[in-house]
Amino acid sequence: MKLLFAFISCLLIFGSSLWSKAEGAKPNVLFIAIDDLNDWVGFMGGHPQARTPHMDALAKQGRNFLNAHCAVPVCSASRASVMSGVAATTHGSYELGPRYEQLPALNDVPTLQRYFKDHGYTTISGGKMLHHNFNGRLVGDIDRSLGRNRSPRPKGPMSRPANWSGAWDWGAYPKADAEMADIQLAHNAAKTLKENFEKPFFMSVGFFRPHVPLFVPPKWFAKYEADKIALPKNPKNDLDDLPKNFLHINDYAVAPTHAEVVSGGKQRSLTHAYLASVSFVDHCVGIVLDALKSSPHADNTLIVLWSDHGFHLGEKQHWAKRTLWEESTRVPLLIAGPGIRSGQPCKEPASL
């Protein structure tokens, strides 16, 4: 949370002299968040088969933080830290609640969007940015909404066993990209980027996949050969050095246990679904980036892309998040645009 908030604060202070050729102009900011995306992207090398051409291209254009980690490995708490610049040890959230506006420690702390709005920016937001959206006293932080829709789900279980949580389902559904909320959001953002604005803008775009349930159209599954999906390495004795109580860390989550996944023969198909979802969201990112390139704002817009936390797919015999292993904490973090040096990955530790 320190890195992003410090960087963006510097935009407001030094933006005119660093990035804009026009006297007095401030840089726009395109702020892209991706839910539950771990290091399974090409430029991070987390999985040898991951296909993410658009994010890979962005990584080459700007600064890629290869050792970036979230503040808390769970959606709501991580996003509260990013949007406030306040550590979880101060704001007190380590789970899916309370809402940002319900945390007493954040009563007088503006969201990132409010901070930009107070400094002369038009704030635009869509999709999943804060976990619980901008509600209550936060409603006025956003000048314009790009929408926050839900993607369709099958009427009943598609791939999951009957005793698993409904969130943990996956498969090639629906048939068309156009039915997916992330695609709709990407096109809304792309359309908005074509417009002219009287003030600089701070546009927040929050994509939901690869968060479970892992439903994406068939074309994204077809990018990977199901029987050739590489599975993460998982030594049988990998947990032998852990305290006994730590072995039950997943018992209180909605995710299945590793034993349930393996005994049910679901590991390869779940891994396939995650990779398909990653390629799908990369396509969504590409729609927005391509629109920016052809827009009147291409030469004066900074791009920040990040994920709220990582995700286990069987590593350390764990699924989902909520651990302090790097599979749960390591995230993509990219900053690109005019004035940002390209081709120089940063390997030093960085915190969202």
Residue ranges and their predicted role:
Residues 2, 7-8, 20-352:
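Formylglycine-dependent sulfatase
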Residues 12-20:
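C-terminal segment of classical bacterial N-terminal signal peptides
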